[in-house]
């Protein structure tokens, strides 16, 4: 476990190894989930990347912040989906960087929204930028806060009652760091499960077996396990 190696090097005051191990941590949350005394190792790792406690730069990220500030995301400069929308939509769909990279997810989500007869707007096509989570994980708190503030303004100005997300990484930071009082933040697996339960969409069971992988941020990070299984079950 990376945490064991990291703590060992901290005791030895081995600055080079501390930097190497801390930088390689994927922040999956496993150490936090199994820690018998409740130490939140992932948060400690982020803090280590942000301060100069051990004499090295807190800047662990090679992300080009210029593009992010200009309104682009990490992987693509524009969304892969172009849909019409009206001014009375209540669902705001934030695709995020990873979902835009794997466009099949966003395309399927949009198709489900259409099938359910739901009005929606895609935030990425209306000024939304990166959620700020990559910057936060890299210890760049101030830059992350700037992104959070800009996205918050867009969300509140949209008049949406629900913010729908596909990316677990985006979902986690929207739940934890954004102040969106009165606006529901929901992952698409939760939303699909709700639509099925309410009878707003019908699912034809194919009789096929599936293997489902719990994303670290969605499962350990946010405690969402049952909804995805019900949706595909």
What function would you assign to each model-found segment?
Residues 88-90, 159-160, 182, 203-209:
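A general structural motif
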Residues 97-98, 189, 216:
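Short, flexible loop/turn elements at secondary-structure junctions
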Residues 182-206:
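Short, flexible loop segments at boundaries between secondary-structure elements
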Residues 170-172, 191-194, 217-220:
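Short, catalytically relevant binding-site loops at active-site mouths
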Residues 106-109, 177-181, 200-201, 225-228:
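Short, glycine/charged-enriched secondary-structure capping and boundary segments
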Residues 2-166, 171-173, 177-178:
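Iron-sulfur-cluster electron-transfer modules
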Residues 197-233:
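Redox cofactor-anchoring modules in respiratory/redox and cofactor-processing assemblies
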Residues 112, 154, 194-195, 231:
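Residues within well-ordered alpha helices
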């Amino acid at each position: 476990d990376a945490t064991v190696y990291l703590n060992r090097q901290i005791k030895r005051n081995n600055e080079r190894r501390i930097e190497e191990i801390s930088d390689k941590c994927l922040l999956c949350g496993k150490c936090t989930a199994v820690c018998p005394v409740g130490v939140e190792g992932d948060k400690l790792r982020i803090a280590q990347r942000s301060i100069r406690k051990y004499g090295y730069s807190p800047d662990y990220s090679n992300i080009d912040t210029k593009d992010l500030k200009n309104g682009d995301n990490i992987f693509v400069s524009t969304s892969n989906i172009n849909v019409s929308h009206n001014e009375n939509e209540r669902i705001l769909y934030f695709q995020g960087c990873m979902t835009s990279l794997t466009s099949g997810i966003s395309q399927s989500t949009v198709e489900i929204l259409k099938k359910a007869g739901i009005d929606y707007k895609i935030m990425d096509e209306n000024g939304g930028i990166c959620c700020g989570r990559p910057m936060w994980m890299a210890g760049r708190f101030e830059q992350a806060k700037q992104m959070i503030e800009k996205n918050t303004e867009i969300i509140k100005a949209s008049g949406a009652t629900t913010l729908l997300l596909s990316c677990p990484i985006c979902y986690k930071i929207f739940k934890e760091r954004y102040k969106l009082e009165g606006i529901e933040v929901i992952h698409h697996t939760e939303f699909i499960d709700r639509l099925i339960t309410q009878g707003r969409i019908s699912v034809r069971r194919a009789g096929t077996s599936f293997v489902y992988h719990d994303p670290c941020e969605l499962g350990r990070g946010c405690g969402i396990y049952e909804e995805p299984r019900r949706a595909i079950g």
